[in-house]
């Protein structure tokens, strides 16, 4: 896999607060190689390492996108939800930004059944057929549709498990990460100083609580995916 230049600068990472970790009491000793200092009771992430692993992640997603692979972006906490949806839509990726339903990947047949139900209800609603039902029946189906839209709206076009999963918060999305490990799906994960860097295929040391930090990381990955997709379109 060829290495490319992704315009990753230490200055912009510092401005985004990527280097700010958690308090020194809330840390995972496995993160020691990725921490450069302590400052006012918090750990400071080594941004040189962040740049290196972010660049590797961009290389990976570019290569995968250039071969037509499918991506899933997962980030369900409030700070990340909107950023995840925007990034995924921009790069034509699937996403989960509300609750992760246990077994979403490992029990794919159940997820597929839910997706079929979701698509059928959307078709019926668009055709106006729900409004022709008795009020009680229509209300029940509309509630089902609303719930399915909330939890499955970001994966409504997904027809199989993804080829690569991008995880915004390791601890928040631990169940999703474990499902990927079980299925052998490659993962890219933002890891703060309280995380385990060994759980993902590519771990990017970064502040996973600051909106600016999450946005910058996602923007770099999305740009690489879009570039890869353009390459795939030009050279199918």
From Swiss-Prot:
Gene name of this polypeptide: rps2
Protein name: Small ribosomal subunit protein uS2c
InterPro entries in the record: Ribosomal_uS2, Ribosomal_uS2_bac/mit/plastid, Ribosomal_uS2_CS, Ribosomal_uS2_flav_dom_sf
One GO BP: translation
Pfam families referenced in this protein's UniProt entry, alphabetically: Ribosomal_S2 (PF00318)
PROSITE patterns: RIBOSOMAL_S2_2 (PS00963)
GO molecular function: structural constituent of ribosome
Domain of life, source organism: Eukaryota
Alphabetized Gene3D superfamilies for the sequence: Glucose-6-phosphate isomerase like protein, domain 1, Helix hairpin bin
Keyword vocabulary terms for this entry: Chloroplast, Plastid, Ribonucleoprotein, Ribosomal protein
Disulfide bridge map: none
């Amino acid at each position: 896999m060829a290495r490319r230049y992704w315009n990753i600068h230490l200055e912009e990472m510092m401005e985004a607060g990527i280097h700010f970790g958690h308090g020194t009491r809330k840390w995972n000793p496995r993160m020691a190689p990725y921490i450069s200092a302590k400052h006012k009771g918090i750990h400071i992430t080594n941004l040189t390492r962040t740049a290196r692993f972010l660049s590797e992640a961009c290389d990976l997603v570019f290569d995968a996108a250039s071969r037509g692979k499918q991506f899933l972006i997962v980030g369900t906490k409030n700070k990340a939800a909107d950023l995840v949806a925007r990034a995924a839509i921009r790069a034509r990726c699937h996403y989960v930004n509300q609750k992760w339903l246990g077994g979403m990947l490992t029990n794919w047949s159940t997820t597929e059944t839910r997706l079929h139900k979701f698509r059928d209800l959307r078709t019926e609603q668009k055709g106006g057929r729900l409004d022709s039902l008795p009020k009680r029946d229509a209300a029940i189906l509309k509630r089902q549709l609303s719930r399915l839209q909330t939890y499955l709206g970001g994966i409504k076009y997904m027809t199989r498990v993804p080829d690569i999963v991008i995880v915004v918060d390791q601890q928040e999305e631990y169940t999703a990460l474990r499902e990927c490990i079980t299925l052998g799906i490659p993962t890219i994960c933002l890891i703060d100083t309280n995380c385990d860097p060994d759980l993902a295929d590519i771990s990017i040391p970064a502040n996973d609580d600051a909106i600016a930090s999450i946005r910058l990381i996602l923007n770099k990955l999305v740009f690489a995916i879009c570039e890869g997709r353009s390459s795939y379109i030009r050279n199918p």
